[in-house]
């Protein structure tokens, strides 16, 4: 009863985003799997599966794709991240095999990747796009801090004000399905630089959230859009 009125109110407050089918294809990876059972014969092995939400554009079977940040490559004392290159062998959404999937909802993507790469959600938090359409990979973030007025509490905890960031403080960063930890390397007024332990792949202007460890839990303290703006001390 009155569902039409409820939907109208929701649309008026939180409009459905414009999901163009012709835009740059972008998918947030939330899960990744190895679907092969123990004892399977080599000829029956299947490639890795990734699952998530297409947020822009569309993808089709046969598309060449990149998954970033990808895999960690160690060269002596230096570490770099290398995007994974592969192709889409199959798409499934709602239990149905598809030739093309568009933005909105969840889907699973079959690839020829080594299942060892995708097992146990190892690719969770990564981003999938076509060659030349991949967002930047960020190992450092320069933020114009937008801290909340109060820290969100639960249970018997008391809400309190949020103190400014401190040099070398460790924060948790969330960007879409990705989670990383960053160390505050520089602060100036309401701006700060963070060095990330794990890089994130995100479009410029996309929003990240910041959480601070309070006791044994992480508490949301602020947010900021990703930007190329550099912090000058």
Model-based region annotation:
Residues 26, 85-87, 181, 220-223:
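Well-ordered beta-strand positions in beta-sheet-rich domains
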Residues 229-233:
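Conserved small/polar residues in nucleotide/adenosyl-binding loops
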């Amino acid at each position: 009863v009155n569902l039409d009125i409820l939907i109208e109110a929701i649309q008026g407050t939180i409009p459905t985003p414009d999901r163009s089918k012709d835009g740059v294809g972008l998918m947030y990876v939330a899960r990744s799997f190895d679907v092969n059972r123990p004892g399977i014969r080599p000829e029956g092995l299947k490639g890795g599966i990734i699952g998530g939400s297409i947020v822009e554009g569309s993808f089709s079977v046969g598309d060449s794709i990149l998954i970033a940040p990808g895999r960690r490559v160690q060269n002596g004392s230096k570490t770099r991240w290398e995007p994974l290159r592969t192709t889409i062998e199959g798409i499934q959404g709602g239990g149905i095999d598809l030739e093309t999937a568009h933005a909105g909802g969840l889907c699973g993507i079959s690839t020829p990747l080594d299942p060892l790469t995708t097992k146990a959600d190892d690719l969770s938090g990564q981003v999938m796009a076509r060659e030349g359409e991949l967002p930047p990979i960020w190992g450092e973030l320069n933020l114009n801090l937008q801290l909340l007025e109060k820290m969100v509490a639960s249970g018997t905890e008391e809400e309190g004000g949020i103190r400014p960031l401190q040099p070398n403080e460790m924060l948790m960063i969330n960007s879409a399905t990705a989670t990383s930890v960053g160390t505050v390397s520089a602060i100036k007024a309401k701006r700060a630089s963070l060095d990330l332990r794990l890089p994130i792949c995100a479009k410029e202007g996309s929003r990240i959230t910041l959480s601070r460890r309070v006791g044994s839990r992480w508490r949301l303290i602020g947010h900021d859009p990703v930007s190329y703006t550099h912090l000058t001390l």
